[in-house]
Amino acid sequence: MNPLIIKLGGVLLDSEEALERLFTALVNYRESHQRPLVIVHGGGCVVDELMKGLNLPVKKKDGLRVTPADQIGIITGALAGTANKTLLAWAKKHHIASVGLFLGDGDSVKVTQLDEALGHVGLAQPGSPKLINMLLENGFLPVVSSIGVTDDGQLMNVNADQAATALAATLGADLILLSDVSGILDGKGQRIAEMTASKAEQLIDQGIITDGMIVKVNAALDAARALGRPVDIASWRHAEQLPALFNGTPIGTRILA
């Protein structure tokens, strides 16, 4: 069975209640299904807190965090350090054997600089499945942060949705993007069950899909095209629905290629 990548985002890492619900759902799912799971995470809220504490400015361009050279070390520490190890600690608490990774481990996801104007922000592309497949075959839950490294050794901050997409392409995995919202909402705040590229373009033009959600929707559309299968955007808030989601039942917005 092909693996399932669960991308975690939003304020999930800040909420003990949400993490408890998520990991309880993961335990229940793993007990009843043999399907291998991989977690990919960002941690914007962890980074924002740290930057605020250090009195450093947070600047975004087109929904992507601008990452100057003097901030990449701090952001790496927050994402590959604090955020990653927090998730590993929760996995340990729930008796799930897990391994913490970043995109560069085993060359799992290849990363190049996206745009000089964004600084240390990376473009993620499929890499080698060897390391993660080996971990999955031995029953481990890989927990992968969205920090990558270029061929010339430069650390890069990668949008976590895009990182998860590249890793899904690497592994031939299905992909779920878990976030703060229950899916993509229309102009009246109602959840849209299915989304196509043309519908997304229309909602972006109308200003209904904005900022970070544009990045999320485009990442999901890219993933659906690259993988040749639908990608789900859903909320982690409804933990009781997560096992159904992991089984392929849509509970948020299903993005069609």
UniProtKB/Swiss-Prot annotation:
Sequence positions that bind ATP: 180-185, 208-210
Any one GO MF term held by the record is: ATP binding
Q: In which pathway does it act?
A: Amino-acid biosynthesis; L-arginine biosynthesis; N(2)-acetyl-L-ornithine from L-glutamate: step 2/4
Q: Which UniProt keywords apply?
A: Amino-acid biosynthesis, Arginine biosynthesis, ATP-binding, Cytoplasm, Kinase, Nucleotide-binding, Transferase
Q: What class of enzyme is it?
A: transferase
Name the residues that bind substrate.
Answer: 43-44, 65, 157
Tell me which positions the record assigns to the signal sequence.
none
Subunit details: Homodimer.
Q: What is this protein called?
A: Acetylglutamate kinase
Protein species of origin: Salmonella schwarzengrund (strain CVM19633)
